[in-house]
Amino acid sequence: MAGVCDAAAPGEGGGGGADGPERTGRGEAEQPGGGGHGPAPQHTETLGFYESDRRREKRRGRAELSLLRFLSAELTRGYFLEHNEAKYTERRERVYTCMRIPRELEKLMFFGIFLCLDAFLYVFTLLPLRVFLALFRLLTLPCYGLRDRRLLQPAQVCDILKGVILVICYFMMHYVDYSMMYHLIRGQSVIKLYIIYNMLEVADRLFSSFGQDILDALYWTATEPKERKRAHIGVIPHFFMAVLYVFLHAILIMVQATTLNVAFNSHNKSLLTIMMSNNFVEIKGSVFKKFEKNNLFQMSNSDIKERFTNYVLLLIVCLRNMEQFSWNPDHLWVLFPDVCMVIASEIAVDIVKHAFITKFNDITADVYSEYRASLAFDLVSSRQKNAYTDYSDSVARRMGFIPLPLAVLLIRVVTSSIKVQGILSYACVILFYFGLISLKILNSIVLLGKSCQYVKEAKMEEKLFNPPPASTPGKPSSKSQSKGKPSQGLSTEENLSASVTSQPGHQKENVIPLLVTSNSDQFLTTPDGDEKDITQENSELKHRSSKKDLLEIDRFTICGNRID
């Protein structure tokens, strides 16, 4: 039996030799686990067996090392900035522009403040002398005979009007009690004083914008040629309007100085801090607006005027405080930190404001040199032989700085704070006056030299020799072209020096002196025959582009920070 079984086993295996492996594989396939009792079955090695095994191992390795791989990728990941070279170069230039803004802005501010100082010193030094010379000519006119149809030149008439307005407003300011105003303001709450100070700033800008129009109307009405048809209310009403304006503006500046004095004398300095924080609110109102070059020039002029006015207000505050403490020099050192804090906050606000305005509007720092050249052009053109207007008036139109109200207030404060008694005191006053004249002359000489340099660097000499005509802005003048031809033989430097240093000669009667050159300053004094020409010129101006030259930007839109 055993032999049969043994013999049958190979027979079965031999008879089913071909099916043996399949049966074995099928049995193993049917019983993969072997009932769970035997050892783990071994898989048959087929095509792609090792590849699938490697995939499983890779998946298992990736699942285990995903965090390490992420960290290594983050630590070793690279990038190339060369793909955005233009963008990064532009960002770097913006940084460099912001770094240059403080230097360029302060150069403009420094030049502009000395321009305002020159116009301000003119009221105290040269204006009284010019008024004296005009009155002397008026008194001695019968000795020379009436060879001229005019008693006085237009510039002399304007000087006399300025002097009379200054004297009348000075005596009117004596009826305003500074001490009562100080105690009235000091009794108010801090928040109310803060609101009052903001209202005074707005009112000061409005007064400055409209005040020069009143003064220009007075000057033009008083000096208008008699041959032209007059359509105005007369010189006397314009004169009273000018006196009223200067008086009200002087009172407004006095209230500003009194409020600042109360802030200085407060115990906890809270009001002074609030008033300084008002400057930073100005950043919010200016930085996020769209500005062009002309608008920025306009705002820069306003900042120059505001900074110079603040300096004069601080001087008035120091004079009043020193008077209260009997001119004790120790008290000056008590005021010195507060004065420095106010000045530093003003400078910081201007720098931050201009830096971000130039950044957001893609304006380069070189634009401030153009602004400086434009201000220098005003100074040089006012020193020419036949200038259109006085220099102090050109500064008022350009920056909105009107020196008459501020001069009236300063004279009132100085005369009430300093008592002049004895011959020695009067001698000191005379020496101080001659010192002011020397300072004015020195300042004018330095400013004139620097202005000529800035005009040459900006290549604006041709505009000096061939200025645009004032009567017809849209048409070229044949007279200016004929005058410009013989000057081409000389060098520009010789022409510039000759035109600046030459004194104004006697004008003929047929030459009409024009006070204002802008189209918005035409008064109701034109003859009927010229009305059609003016309407045609106005229609031509409407079709022009909205952008203007920097030399045409004045203080007429300085409050709105916009240019039509």
UniProtKB/Swiss-Prot annotation:
Residue ranges with Low complexity bias: 1-10, 473-489
Membrane protein topology class: Multi-pass membrane protein
Tissue spec. comment: Ubiquitous. Expressed throughout embryo.
Entry keyword set: Acetylation, Cell projection, Chondrogenesis, Cilium, Cilium biogenesis/degradation, Cytoplasm, Cytoskeleton, Developmental protein, Differentiation, Membrane, Osteogenesis, Phosphoprotein, Transmembrane, Transmembrane helix
Phosphoserine found at: S520
Modified residues (N-acetylalanine): A2
Subcellular location as annotated: Cytoplasm, Cytoskeleton, Microtubule organizing center, Centrosome; Cytoplasm, Cytoskeleton, Cilium basal body; Membrane
Disruption phenotype: Mice die during perinatal development and are the cause of the L5Jcs1 phenotype. They exhibit posterior-to-anterior transformations of the vertebral column midsection, similar to mice deficient for Hoxc8 and Hoxc9.
Keyword Metal-binding: no
Basic and acidic residues composition bias: residue spans: 20-29, 532-546
Family: Belongs to the TAPT1 family.
GO-annotated biological processes: cartilage development; cell projection organization; embryonic skeletal system development; neural crest cell development; ossification; positive regulation of bone development; positive regulation of cartilage development; positive regulation of cilium assembly
Biased composition (Polar residues): 490-505, 516-525
General function of this protein: Plays a role in primary cilia formation. May act as a downstream effector of HOXC8 possibly by transducing or transmitting extracellular information required for axial skeletal patterning during development. May be involved in cartilage and bone development. May play a role in the differentiation of cranial neural crest cells.
InterPro entries documented for this protein: Tatp1
Transmembrane segment boundaries: 108-128, 154-176, 233-253, 332-352, 400-420, 429-449
Superkingdom of origin: Eukaryota
Organism: Mus musculus (Mouse)
Region (Disordered) location: 1-55, 464-546
Modified residues (Phosphothreonine): T526
Keyword Transmembrane: yes
GO-annotated cellular components: centrosome; ciliary basal body; cytosol; membrane; nucleoplasm
GN (gene name): Tapt1
Protein name: Transmembrane anterior posterior transformation protein 1
